[in-house]
Structure formats: structure tokens, C-alpha cells
Amino acid sequence: VSGPRTQAEPVTLTVDGSEVIVPKGTLIIRAAENLGIEIPRFCDHPFLDPIGACRQCYVEIEGQRKLFTSCTTEVAPGMVVRTQNTSDEAHRAQVANLEFLLLNHPLDCPICDRGGECPLQDQAMSFGPGESRYAEPKRTYEKPIALSPLVKLDRERCVLCARCTRFCDEISGDRFIELFARGAGERVSIAAGEDFRSPFSGNTVQICPVGALTAEPYRFVARPFDLTTADSVCQHCSAGCNIRVDLRRGSVVRVLARDNADVNDAWTCDKGRFAFRHADLPGRVTTPLIRDRGLEPASFGEVFADIAEWSREGRAAFLSGGRLPDEDAYALAKLARVAFGTNDLDHRRTFHGGRAEQLAAASPLDTTYRDLERAKVILVAGLDAEQEVPILNLRIRKAARRGAAVFVIHPRRTRLWDVAEHTLCLPEHQTYVLERIHDGEAPGDAFEGRVSGALREAAGEAVVLVGERLTEHPLAADVALRVAQRYGAHMALVPRRSGDRGALRAGVHPSLLPGGRRVSDQAERAEIEGSWGSLPAEPGRSTRQILEACANREIDVLFLIGIDPLRDIPDADLARRALSNTRHVVVQSLELGSLEPFADAFLPAAAWIEREGHATDWEGRSQPIHAVRGPTGVSRADWEIFEGLAEAMGRPLGFGDLGALRAEAAPLLEPRPVTSRSTAWTGTGRPQRLGELTLLAYPLLVDEGRLSEGADELKAALGQDPFVELHPEDADKRGLVDGGRATVTTEAGEAVLDVRVTEHIAQGAAFVPFNQPGLAANELLSGSFTTAVRIEPAVAEPAVAEGAA
């Protein structure tokens, strides 16, 4: 997607006597950094536009009569710069400016959360005045001011660097926090009556240089020197955000974003930042269990032996929750086929990826974040990036700021509404829209025509992003692939969960082996058999087909690895019947939860902060996960459990350690060519919608998911009560009003919900959040996240007269 780019002209300058060559347009402060020279600053941030607000980075430029702010001044050929290290004038200016900033700054370092890692504290100690000449009382404010349940403001600490407001304006686009008033009264605040309700609010806390903004979950919890830290990769979604995990006395107390310009820049979402307590909750089970008049503690060996006995006598199937690290996913794919002789394994909830899915399994890093930044056109289909892969949303916004044209096909208007053109259409119509874009025959004033024209003009510098909601419909992903192929664009399937791409690549799939090799293709299967031995040749069953087989008593042993069908599968009735009718259910997870009545064995898995491995993000980029602490109890990494199961079955996997596992997997997971011909959609005309309305149900960013357990402040800030969302015309036809109550009825079930009326949803569609507190949306579904629905005003319950019996 990159295409030809003009190389920036090199510029040679001198900083503190050392010569440096940098591209034209580089700021002086960055040129100094290239030489290892640190110029003090507060407002400057490498991922924000320069502003020169704090005036702390003054430098002297030879031949100029005044000092310059190095964070706003670009280099010039032959420029000679003197920083505070070699210029007395620059040093005096910085000391004076620091003294000015300290006039009203409180001396509360001993209780400030920024103490020990504060740039203002460091600079004051390094070259600031030892005593203040200011004799008047310092300015004070009410403290703390709760901007949201997550973010607190100690206003008297603020130095008005505008980092927080610039982040909201330039990066996230949700301008809840702003600078108000002017002069001595200028202050950071939010509008009266509003919360700082942003899924990226924690970034403002991390980039605040003085502790004016603090995070409620970390407030007064620890000092930097109390912490042990480790670098890792966030496991909440497929964004692949680089993070730092901080522990105090063995428990996670803070998560920070790490800089990586190729992935997350310097940001992470609030879910990744604040949902970190799940591994330490009381409900976690850290010892193996076996059912014997109830679930009783046992050794791993005892549980493995019982499972092996059950499995030798019957048929087994495996369902994974899509969050396994890459190594563990590979071990699971081998375990199912080698030790249990089955292709009945899947990590997907509902998915029709077609050839696009095979390409994603075989060709990692085909489309990247960098491609998005360079793209002239971005087409987003069936993906609500902010709710599903939040950092991807920020990168799309970044591309839009640089001039990219962004188009979105979705039933709901996403948070990209201010930088993208949307077409709101029912799920079953999205394939039709894509086919019209592919044909390129729509009139130029139609959405499809504008997208076709933009893709044509982009001449290959375009990206097509396909979300899970699109892939629920057969052939939709293949049609999107045909669009990308016709216009020379890159395409990526964007899964929601952190382990989905790695599981697909590793072969946790009923019809694909590692590297996207087809089970049904003898030659491709033979490539894996050379390492694994003889494999079953018939493709297995998908997640839904496995559950149906369990419900029909065709499966004897069902392995649930990090998945709870009662919560995760869009068909609660099928999940209950499957669990009830399966002879033996084996649960491998951190907790039992709602599966306790059905589990015959429990295998305690180590949390992601307790083990080593790799995680593959939506791009196909594999990044290392590092253990922050040792396993809790006797829990084990998933791959170690799989090895123990295989040995009990008499078919050891032969790994021994992670190094051996990786050595075996590496050649089988190398990128390989795949014939990319996709299947054409054969629909005629615009498809007819099903039923009165089409109900959509998919998870929002903050839900009742297991990784969000314990994140009470996050849920208070961003969580939502259950609701049903409709278009105004659909609401009017049914006598529904915003804020009222409605009865939502499908073939599967019924619920009474609050009504939200908005033009941000397609006419003919209704939306309910999946897995929200107080609503089990899968009770309304029958195997897909969309279904026909009837919605009508709720009948008020008759009032009971006062004093009545």
C-alpha cells in the first residue's frame, strides 16, 4: 500500500558542538534527542502536534537575537543550536520559567501519585531554585475534582501544558476535556453536568507530566520504587497494544502503554489499562478438580488419567475461547488431531471467512497499521473499531487527519462518524453494497459510486478492513476480498479477540491446519503429517455444529478451553442442551463460573500475566508476552496442560519446553502462497430484510466479559445498562419513545428493555448489547448475532393499591 514516497531532504546542523543529520522538517528537540541530549519540556509529546505552551525547552540559536522553543522550531541547514548544557542564557531562561511554574504548584510530592516519576519534580531537583521568592499564599482549588469514575483532577498541580486536551482533540476525537477561560483563570475542565466519558481517558493520565490527572484505581496505591514491572502485550482485543504491567506485593496495580510506533503509538484503551484484576479475584480456581459427589480437588495426574479413560471410549471435541497465546493454540491444534484423532475443534463463535480466512491464516503481516497510515482510502465493513479494536480506531482517525478518505459500511454509525462517510444498512444488505462497489457501476452520487471512484483513484494505496459482524454472513468476506483484489487494495480480517488470529494461523479450526493448509487437501495435509504423523482427513465441525452434536449426544467428551458457551455463544438454549447432554465436560480456565454444574473435570490455567508466550494481533504480527509473576496455586500454562493430556492418552506431543514447541511450529507457520480466488456473490437485487426488524447483538467495549471482572471503576465510567436502540421512524411506527420501555421478542426469547431512539442506526434494524449486566442477549438469539425480532411497547404492570393484601 505504501507506493512511491518522496524522501525527505537531509539537513545538517550542530547541537552543543555535535553535528547531526536529520530529515527536513525535524524539530530541534528531536534532533537533540538523536544525539542523546535531553532538553527539558512539559508540553512536548512525540505523538502530539507541537504547541510551545510551557516554554521550558528554550534553546539559543547562533545568529538569532532571542531564544526559541525547541519543540516548535524546525531545523535548518547549517543551524548551530546551544541547549541549556552550553548556553547560560538558555539555562537561565529555563530556571526562571521553572520558578514561575512552581509559584502556585503545591509541595505535595509525598502524597502525589506522580512522585518519583514526575518531570517537574525531576527538573526542580536538578536545576530549580532551592527556595521560592514568592511570599503570597498559593492558589488552591477544591480537590480532587472527579472528571469521571476513572479520572481525578488536582487542579492546583496543573501547568497548562495542554497535553490532555490535545490528546482528546487530535487523537481520540472525543473532546470532553478542554481548557476554559483565559489568563490567570485558565483551567482544565469538562462541561458542566458531563463526565469525561471516553474509552481512552487513561491516556491523559499517563501523559500528564505533573500529577494533575490521576487514575482512581491507582490513586494512593504505590510508589514507583515499590513496584516490579514487566513488558507485555495487552490481551483484551486483537490490537496488540504494547504495555507495561506494574505489580506490588504480587498483585497487578497498574498497566501503562508502551511506545511502539508500529502498533499502538503511545496509547491504549481504558479496558486494556484498567481491567487488570481478573487474575486475583476470589472466584479463581487454582487446583485441578474432578467430579465425585461434587467437584473435589485432585492432582493433575489423576484428572488426566480420568479424562484419558473417558476419551478412549468415546468421541471428543474442543472449543477454545479465542484468547490462547500462539504457542498454546498450536499445541491445541496438535493435541486434538494427534492425541484425540479429531478435527472437531474451533475457536470461532460465528464466522464465514471463506478464502479470505485461509489467506489470513497463511499470510501474516499482509496489512499493517503502517499501511493504514499511508493509505489514501480506507473502507471499513462490518467493524465498529472503537468498540471492538479501539487502537485501530485511533489509527484510522490518524490516517483521516493526514487526508485519507474513510468509508464505513455498518448497521450503526460508529465513532468514526466525524471523519468518515457512513452508509447505514442492515447486516443482510452489506454484501449487496460491497458487490456494487466491486462492480463499479453505481452512479457517482451514490455511496457505492463514491467508494468505487475513490478506490480507483487511490491506485492501490487503499485498505479494506472487514469485521466479525460482516463475516457472520456467508460469502460476505469473499466479496470484500474481491473488492480489494479488483482495486489493488490490501485487505484484513479484523477479529475482536486477542488470540483469534493466532488460533487461525495455528490451525484451531475444523478445516484448516497450521499455516492455512486445508484438511481436505492431501498434499497440504501431508506437509503437516511430516511433523505430526497421520492425521484425520475429513474436515471437522464448527462451534455451532459441535454444540449441536453435543445436544444430540454425538460427543462424549467436550473440552472447553477459556470459553463459557452459556455466556459466549449466541444461542443460550443450544448451549444448555449441549452441556446437559454431553457425558463428560472438561473445563480449562481460570474459573468455573456458570459451568460449575456441568463440569466433570477442571484444569486450572495460568493467567496471561503468569506465563511466557506470543500473541498475534489483527495484522498477523506476533509479539512476546512476558510473565510478570509465577503461576498461582498449581495452575499451568495451557500448552503444559495439553502436553499432560497427550501423555495420558499415550500420544505425547514431544515439546518438553517452549523452545522445542516454537522450533517445531516455526517452519509450519511460515508465510505461504495461497490461491486467492474467492466466490462471487450470486444474489439478485437488494436482499429483503427478515421479519419486522433485524435484531443486532454484539459486545460493547465494556461488558460482563471475564477479563473485565473486578474493574468496577471502568464499568462505572463506561458501562451501560441494557437497552434496545431503534431508528426514529421504526420507533414511531410502534409507538415507542426515547426513554420508554419495550418488549423485545424473538423466536428464542423475550426481554423488556429501555428504549433509545437515534438516527445513528439503520432503519429496519434494532440493536441490543451482547453480554451486558442485567441482559443475557444470547437468550434472544438462535445461533447468529442477528435475528428477526418484534418490538412493541411494554405493558405496564398494574399498580398495587396501598394497603392491599
Where are these regions (language model features)?
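Short, charged, surface-exposed secondary-structure boundary motifs
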Residues: 354-358, 417-419, 432-438, 502-503, ...
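A generic structural motif
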Residues: 342-354, 403-413, 488-502, 582-595
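Glycine-rich phosphate/diphosphate-binding loops that line cofactor/substrate pockets in enzymes
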Residues: 303-316, 368-376, 450-463, 487, ...
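Short acidic (Asp/Glu) and glycine-rich catalytic loops that position anionic groups and cofactors
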Residues: 74-79, 183-187, 283-288, 375, ...
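N-terminal export/assembly segments and adjacent metallocofactor-ligating motifs
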Residues: 2-27, 33, 45, 60-64, ...
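A cross-kingdom feature strongest in bacterial/archaeal respiratory oxidoreductases
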Residues: 2, 39, 44, 333, ...
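Long hydrophobic segments that form regular secondary structure
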Residues: 249-257, 261-266, 271-280, 287-288, ...
